[in-house]
Amino acid sequence: MSWSFFVNHYQNETQARRDSKYTYRLSNGTLWYGLDPPEDAEPLGILYPRGATLGGSAQLNAMNFALPPESDWNYIAELTGDKSWSSNNMRRLFVDLENCTYAPEGTPGHGFDGFIASNRNNISYITERPGVVEVLTHAFRLTEDIEVENAEEVGTLMQRDINSIGPDRYAPGLYQLPLHIDGLRQRTGSWGYLHETLIAKTEDGSPKYPLTISTQSLATRVLFKDGKDGKPRAYGVEYLKGEGLYSADKRYNESDSGQLMNVTASREVIVAGGAFNTPQILKLSGVGPREELESHDIDVVVDLPAVGNYLQDNYEGGVTVEASIPWENNPFARCDFSLGPNDTCLQEWNQSHTGPYGEGAAPLGLLYKSSVSETDESDLFLFGAAGVVFRGYFPGYSTYQAPPTSWFWSVVKMQTGNQAGTITLRSADPREAPEINFNFFAEKGDRDLQAIQEAVEHTMQIFNATGEPYAPYTVIEPPPSVDVRQGIMDEAFSHHATSTCRMGPAGDKDYCVDSNFKVNGVDGLRVVDASIFPRTPGGFPAAPTFVISQKAFEVILKSIKN
C-alpha cells in the first residue's frame, strides 16, 4: 500500500548522516540504518513512505483530522485575491464533507451528513492510567495555568474540541486529537467514497455512475495539443499498465516496463499525485522549469519554474524519555503487532471493533506557542503517548516496540519558514522516483529551531514536575550527548510534504496554479492535492486536503454549469 521514497534532509552530507535513521543499502540488497554503516553500504537517505493505493496517504496515515488555523485559509484568500478561500467559506466546505460522530448533532462548525466520518480515541485510555493522569495534571498547569484535581477533570478537559468554532481554537492547551474514523472505529476517506460510487447500480443492474478506476497503473505524462490561440490544452493522460512499475515500490523490477496506454478527456485532466508525484508528472509532461526539462530532452510545453520548487513540510522533533517504572495500564501491552492468529488485539478488533487497534494518531495533543510565533496563535502542535514511541521513519519502524517505561512527544512545527525544498527529475523515465531535497533549516532555520527547542524544554519541565515513582527519567531524545539544537537537527524528520505546485495569483510563474486549481500557462489541466498549498497548513495536512478537494468539486461543477 505504500511507496518507499528516500529523501535528503540536508545538502551537507556530514550533517545528514548524523541522523540515526539514515538508511543505506548493503551489497546483498538489504537495508541498514544507523550511525556507523558497513564499508559496502550505499547511502539512500531518510525513509519517507507515501500512500500508493486508492485514496493515497489518507489510507495509511495516523488519521489525524485536525483543521488548520483560520489564518492559513485567510492567507490563501489574500494571496490569490479570491475571497472564496476565506476561513468562513472553507469551514462551510468542511461541514459539507464531515460526518461527525463525537459532537452532538447540530453543533456549529461540524457536519453530520458528509462522506468523511470523524471520531476521537477512547478517553479511558487516558483517564484509567494513573501515570498519564499525573503527567497531564502538570501539563495543564504549565501550559494553561489550570489546576486539575483528578482523572475525571483531566478527561473533561481533554475532550474539548480543537475543531470547534472560536477565536481561541489555537490557543495553548491540551486536547484529544480528532480522527477520520467512524463510529465503528474504521478509517474513512476518499477510498470509501470512490468504492461506493463504483459499485452503485441502477434498478436494472447497470452502473449508476460513469466512473472507471484503473488500478495497477502508473501515470507517465499529460497529453497536450494546441488549443485556442495556440495555448497548450490538456486532452488526455498516458500511462503504463502493470504491477509495481514505480521504483519506490517494493515489487519494482527494472526489466518490467509495463504496457503503454492512454486515455482521453472530454473536458479536463486533473492531477492528484501528491507533493512528490504531481511535480514529477507535470515535468515529464513538459510543464516545469525549462532548463531542467531540456537537460532530460523533454519537450517544453510551458516554462513554469514553480513546479517542483518551494517544497515545504512540518518539522518534527522527537522527545523520548524512559521512566523509572512502566506506565500503568498500557492498552497496547497485550498486543504483539504480528496481525497473526495469536494477536489478541487483532482478535478483539475483528470480533467487536474495539480495543487498541481501533485507536488512531496518539491519545494526547498539546498546542504550544513559542516566543517566535508569527501570530498570536500556537506555532507548535505536539502529540504523544506513554508506553509507545514514534520518532520518525526507518526500515522496520512499524514493528518497533518501545520499552513500557517510554513516553514520547512529537513536536510538530507549524508556520515553518523554510521554502527551499526541491523535487527534481533524475531522468525522463517515469518509473524512476525523483530526487527529493528538503534542505532542512535552510531558510529561517534559527527561528524554527528556537521554537522547537522551547517546546522540547516545555515537555521536559512537565516531566521534571512529575516526581516519583516515575522519576528520575532517562532522556533518550534529543540525544543528551549534544547541544539541544544540534540534537534537534540530527534527528528531525517530516512527513507532511506540500507546496511543490503552490497556489497563487493567476499567471504568476512563481506559482503553479491559480485559485481555481488551474495550472498556469495551459488550459484543461488542474491540480488538486496537497502540493497546491502555498504553505503547509497547520500541523497535519489530511483534513485541509480533504477540504480543498471539496472546494475543487464546487469549482469544477460551477465551471461545467457555466
Question: What feature does the model see in each segment?
Answer:
Residues F6-E39:
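Core domains of carbohydrate- and sulfate-ester-processing enzymes
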Residues A41-P43:
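Conserved oxyanion/phosphate-binding beta-strand-loop segments in alpha/beta enzyme cores
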Residues M1-F6, Q11, G45-Y48, T53-L54, ...:
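Structural core of flavin- and non-heme-iron oxidoreductases
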